Amino acid sequence: MSKRRAYPQPQYAISQDQAPATPPVGASAAYGVPQVAQQFQQMNINPQPGAQPGAAVPQGYGYNQYGQQPQPGQAYDPYQQPPQANTGFGGQQQTPSQQPYQQQGGYFGAGAGGQAAPALPLNQLYTTDLSRELPPPISDLSLPPPPLVIPSNTAIVPTSEDSNASPDYFRSTLNVIPNNGTLLKRSKLPLALVVRPYTTLRVDQENIPAASDTIISRCRRCRCYINPFVTLTEQGRRWRCNLCNLQNDIPAAFEYDETRGVPRNKFDRVELNHSVVEFVAPKEYMARAPQPIVFVFVIDVSADAVNSGLTSTVTRTILESLDRIPNQNKTARVAFLGVDSNLHYFRFDEGLEGSELLIASDLDEPFLPSPSGLLINLEENRPAIEKLLIDFPTYFENTANTQFALGPALKAGHKMIANIGGKLITFAASLPNIGEGKLSVRDEASHSGQPKESQMLLGAADKFYKSFAVECNSAQVTVDLFLTSARYQDVATLSNLPRFTAGQTHFYPAWSCVKPEDVTKLSKEISEHLSMDIALEAVLRVRSSTGMRSSAFYGNFFNRSSDLCSFPSFPRDQSYVIEMSIEETITKPVVYFQAASLHSTSYGERRIRVMNLAIPTSSKLDDIYASADQLAIANYFTHKAVEKALASSLPDARNYIVKSIVDILNVYKKELVAGNVSGSSPLQISTNLRMLPLLLFSLTKHLGLRGERVPSDHRAAALNRLSSLPIPHLIKYIYPTVYSLHNMGDECGLPEQTVTVNEETGEEETTSGGILLPEPINDTKASWENYGLYLIDNSSEVFLWVSGDVVPDLVYDLFGTDNLYSIPTGKTELPELQPDESEFNYRVRNILGKIREQKDQITWKNLYVVIGGSSNEPIEISQQRDLMALRMWALSCLVEDKTANEQGYREFLTSLKGKVAQ
């Protein structure tokens, strides 16, 4: 048991008979019930699978993760796969036909078409009652999806641990696929794929095997890439496509290395062993030679931008980030364009250490004032570029120009790079108010919070931006936006630019260089953005087994055809959802999906990243529910809700979410509850879906969808994030993570210590890992203590809540003062006390650093310190409007709680009960 820091709390001592109904802060999600061993205690069900044997589980997909216990005599961790040494399904001894690399009635390594495997028991269905799961066990949010249970001979190399894709890259909302469309519709569960081709910002941070010999074998009919699930036929000379069943020839180079003159073992090839792999593409995969990295910096130089410090901060950050721009082969090119009521170009002469300012005032027909010297090689012109970035703010320091011609500037930038493609990275502190694409302030007072809010405030106010974005996409040009205005900026309209060009909208409301924290956030995010290893001229296509097809696509890209998604540049911090439909009855026990991204790397190499997924099928509704992935389903419903919010109305989006939950509960009650007892609870659901109602309820209260009045720029920015975030960040954005700090274990905030035994010496060795975080607690005030200290992470910001009745010693340990009301509040940073002065301060700063540490997002999370209310609070404190607003903002993260205008999770379940019972 971990130690707890003991702060004096005599004024809060509670006798046994006065113990509160709410559990102590820091308790597990089950509030006193051991998280794994007794997780099913409140469900009134047997956590053991009973007579049904457990199936062998692909490594990496979790095992028995919803509380099933190991059998007597087994000592494996319940969240891990049990030992599989020479065992078959359910722990049985393997027969010769199950042993890897055997020839039992089929060719060596025959794959999916080898000896038929017996029918597998799929994941067991466990039922839980949502009304008895309060507070909800949020530890489920960190669990992997239900296991993918497929026959051992599905993969061509049965011993490969990576034959099925990790859910980090490729996952399905259903880990058992209905065998016909009627069953899918009856289930009311969505069938969609979540694709995330890249999981880190930089290539060197991930380890994806690559086939570098440019030998690529594809199906002649469906163009599927050879993969771990194909079948070898004719003694290994041909392979049968696992998607369309066509036979294809095995390339001779799979068996013989012509360059070295030595034989090869085809079973060693990475594409037959790994589900996520890259191919180095030959010339036939190139419409033209790979293009260099190209950045055109479009910088607002109007009075708003200059006075707020945006112009100087941006140019200084670019200067400091030049070495971070991916430029391995020294071909990266850059251009700079200042924008107010004129277009300010900067022309460079080769070999000179300066640049020439060229001003164009014709906004109707933007033209390039020089045929050369505007777009230049970064490496060859480094001194001149550095000098320009140092001098750039001085060109505009005394400006009184309040106009901002964004539309003409974008068209000019497009002209510069239309023949090679690239990125238009745009920094704006003003509303575009002159030239093509001119926008005006909308009437928020009349429409915010009203039924027509979507049409009047969230739709595009000018068709120029979408049409221009589509034009950019066809020219391989991406637009990224960094918006910092203190006033209305029409994010809803401008965000069409990144949405259809595979870019992103970054929003910094009321940004000012006077606030060091604002400067830090913008600078860090620009720098991370510039250093990201983007993929250029990319397309993404998802293929599936015969009888299925893709029917809808969600994310930031342009859908070029029925199944081809176009990305001028492929960002590494977003994910995408593809909805699937079942067109024919599926007769095979396993279906397959393959996602392939063709792209050019930032170092000039054409590559194809291929991801493969094999999923079992079933005709039983209970199999489908038992293997549904609640996080992927929540991701799908988020995209659908955003789509409805923009196309129809916010109330329609919220109603859609609630109706979806009701439909799922109705199906479960009518078809899967044992005996369908009339008096049974209407809130029963499979255990693996018990967090889905909480997530979707939280989504209805999110800034992007809630019914209250919300500034339209903030709402539009939130909708953009909801429709592009990868699942781990999306879940935190919907349901924030809350940590209790005042009673965390002594090991929290310090490097995790792992003790291992050296096999040679027999001595214990201790290694240090990452910073250990406290266990999250539920998003409700009921899990808080009025003298506590809490950290709230909502994926965008971090709030440090200091309760109004906090113990003075705790304040002193963290802030170096025992005067609660003297500590800085709002956007700030913690004081850096030395470990010998305050270990607690050191540990909390470590925790904050760990939360901010992200290898897959550019987001820098600002810290907001909030002092909670108290009956002893000085009157001058309670009258501070900024502090009151800050409290409301932080408390809005406690989504399980009831507010003045919105119901809490308990009330929501009560309302669901009435809807389902009808």
Curated annotation (Swiss-Prot):
Function: Component of the coat protein complex II (COPII) which promotes the formation of transport vesicles from the endoplasmic reticulum (ER). The coat has two main functions, the physical deformation of the endoplasmic reticulum membrane into vesicles and the selection of cargo molecules.
Subcellular localization(s) per the UniProt record: Cytoplasm; Cytoplasmic vesicle, COPII-coated vesicle membrane; Endoplasmic reticulum membrane; Golgi apparatus membrane
CC annotations in GO: cis-Golgi network; COPII vesicle coat; endoplasmic reticulum exit site; endoplasmic reticulum membrane; equatorial cell cortex; Golgi membrane
Gene Ontology molecular function terms on file: SNARE binding; zinc ion binding
Domain of life: Eukaryota
Subunit and partners: The COPII coat is composed of at least 5 proteins: the SEC23/24 complex, the SEC13/31 complex, and the protein SAR1. Golgi apparatus membrane; Peripheral membrane protein; Cytoplasmic side.
Gene Ontology biological-process entries: COPII-coated vesicle cargo loading; intracellular protein transport
Name of the protein in its database record: Protein transport protein SEC24
Record InterPro entries: ADF-H/Gelsolin-like_dom_sf, Gelsolin-like_dom, Gelsolin-like_dom_sf, Sec23/24_helical_dom, Sec23/24_helical_dom_sf, Sec23/24_trunk_dom, Sec23_24_beta_S, SEC23_SEC24_subfamily
Topology in the lipid bilayer: Peripheral membrane protein
Bias-annotated ranges (Low complexity): 47-84, 92-105
Keywords tagged on the record: Cytoplasm, Cytoplasmic vesicle, Endoplasmic reticulum, ER-Golgi transport, Golgi apparatus, Membrane, Metal-binding, Protein transport, Transport, Zinc
Binding site for Zn(2+): 219, 222, 241, 244
Region (Disordered): 1-28, 41-112
Region: Zinc finger-like, residue numbers: 219-244
Coiled-coil stretches: none
Family the UniProt entry places it in: Belongs to the SEC23/SEC24 family. SEC24 subfamily.
